Amino acid sequence: VDFETYCKPTYDSGPCKGYFPRWWFNVKTGQCEEFIYGGCQGNKNNHVTRKECETRCLRKQLSRLHFSPPVDQYPYGDTERSNEEVPEYPPVHLNDSLEVSAVMNQRPLRNYTKQHKPNVTSDFSAISLTSGVDFETYCKPTHDRGPCKAYIPRWWFNVKTGQCEQFIYGGCQGNKNNYETKSICETNCLRRQLSELGVSADVHYRKHWNETKYSPNVTVEYPAVHFNVTLNPVCNEPKYPELCKGYFPRYYYNSRSKTCKKFIYGGCQSNGNNFLTLEECENTCLVDLQV
């Protein structure tokens, strides 16, 4: 969607007097918030559900970055160093990691943390999917039914498959890798190392100095950078061969070109990389990350 049109305006209840709970994206907080729509006019930042709002608009604002400006090694009035060559643009170093949000399958994922290389100003050394829980304790252990004999369906995160899977919990003891729903499990544990992402992306910081030459005061602007990241295992499957003779236009995700492409499905069997619409394919297989 057009972010400027559907996500950036402040909510507008409109002139009518109806009472329709709706959701709008607040660019200042980076969150979808509820408001009351009157029923007519208003603007496009008006979404029927929170899920719809987050799918269209969720972007995390990176306003809390901390920068360590270079030290002025050549202060004015230092006559002993007045003839030394001084670099006009000393490097800018980042103290903190950058965090962005991602949406896949119409729900927000956990934060991607992009770690900046020490003393480098143009790329990042690692990207990983993290959550607020202790991964070693809540996600890494194998599921444990416990000694009791109850029959309680639960979910656990399997680090080998990278998926949340169901198991039967006995009702007592066990370990922390034990969730009531698949959604909670994925929220806490779903993470994939993104080493294949091409992390030396085109993130080039533009330095802006004040009028006093060599001053340590500096601000850094960061442009939007997009990454397409495949997270769903079915998206790595090849296009399924046409075994049957049906003619059903479908879409599959091409992991080489990192795009969804059209193909003709024969009508029988499938490896999961088979989608009715282009939108369904992209929602399942592509994550748009924005710094």
Swiss-Prot record:
Subcellular localization, as worded in the UniProt entry: Secreted
Protein name: Kunitz-type serine protease inhibitor 6
Site, as annotated: Reactive bond: 17-18, 149-150, 245-246
BPTI/Kunitz inhibitor domain boundaries: 7-57, 139-189, 235-285
Record organism: Rhipicephalus microplus (Cattle tick)
GO cellular component: extracellular space
Signal peptide (residue range): none
Pfam families hit by this protein: Kunitz_BPTI
Glycosylation site residues: 95, 111, 119, 210, 217, 228
Keyword check for Thylakoid: no
Repeat as UniProt keyword: yes
Molecular-function annotations in GO: serine-type endopeptidase inhibitor activity
Cystine bridges: 7-57, 16-40, 32-53, 139-189, 148-172, 164-185, 235-285, 244-268, 260-281
InterPro entries according to UniProt: Kunitz_BPTI, Kunitz_BPTI_sf, Prtase_inh_Kunz-CS, TFPI/VKTCI-like
